[in-house]
């Protein structure tokens, strides 16, 4: 599936021809898309001593829009059959026995890795959005970004420093409190980490 994303500043009437089944939303609603992959497998003994693992893999692209039900944009199903007779006879395929682990199912580790990857990625995006909201909120009141200011720019700096660490802030502190000796009481600025 191919997507061509265009900025809202460009002509809004263009729709990707490969996505003709998707109705264009030009009303400014907040929508997101996500891909859901489900795999269901079962092992069957098709004849005495012969085992086949049958899997059904479903991939769906879903669109979530505020105030609307979830919409299935695309859905694909894939069926596979694998001969697992050797694995079953050797005992390497687990059917939930305690000695091999209750969660030792084929493909489970991959699913767990995908869940972890998606969860941590979503969590980091959440924290980035929360930090952006915090910065926007405090900047609307004119509160300076003590920990985000670099030496010569107003953009956030990846280097975090204590408020008196930069020379510019040290000079401002000395002017405000009339001290030139460098002796500063930092007890009020200490924070738990």
Swiss-Prot record:
PANTHER family referenced in this protein's UniProt entry, alphabetically: MAL D 1-ASSOCIATED PROTEIN
Q: Which InterPro entries match?
A: Fra_a_1-associated
> Source gene?
AP
Highest taxon, organism lineage: Eukaryota
Where are the annotated segments for Disordered? Answer: 1-27
Q: What is the protein name stated in its UniProt record?
A: Fra a 1-associated protein
Its assembly, as annotated, is:
Interacts with FRAA1E, FRAA2 and FRAA3.
């Amino acid at each position: 599936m191919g997507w061509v994303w265009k900025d809202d500043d460009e002509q809004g009437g263009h729709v990707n021809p490969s996505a003709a089944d998707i109705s264009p939303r030009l009303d400014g609603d907040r929508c997101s898309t996500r891909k859901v992959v489900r795999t269901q497998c079962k092992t069957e003994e098709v004849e005495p001593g012969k085992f086949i693992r049958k899997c059904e893999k479903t991939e769906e692209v879903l669109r979530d829009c505020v105030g609307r039900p979830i919409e299935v944009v695309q859905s694909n199903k894939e069926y596979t059959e694998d001969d697992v007779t050797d694995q079953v006879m050797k005992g390497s395929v687990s059917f939930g026995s305690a000695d091999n682990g209750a969660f030792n199912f084929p493909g489970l580790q991959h699913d767990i890795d995908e869940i972890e990857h998606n969860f941590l990625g979503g969590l980091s995006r959440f924290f980035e959005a929360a930090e952006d909201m915090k910065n926007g909120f405090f900047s609307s009141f004119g509160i300076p970004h003590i920990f985000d200011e670099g030496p010569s720019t107003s953009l956030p700096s990846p280097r975090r420093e204590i408020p008196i660490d930069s020379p510019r802030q040290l000079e401002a502190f000395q002017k405000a409190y009339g001290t030139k000796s460098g002796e500063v009481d930092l007890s009020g600025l200490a924070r738990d980490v």
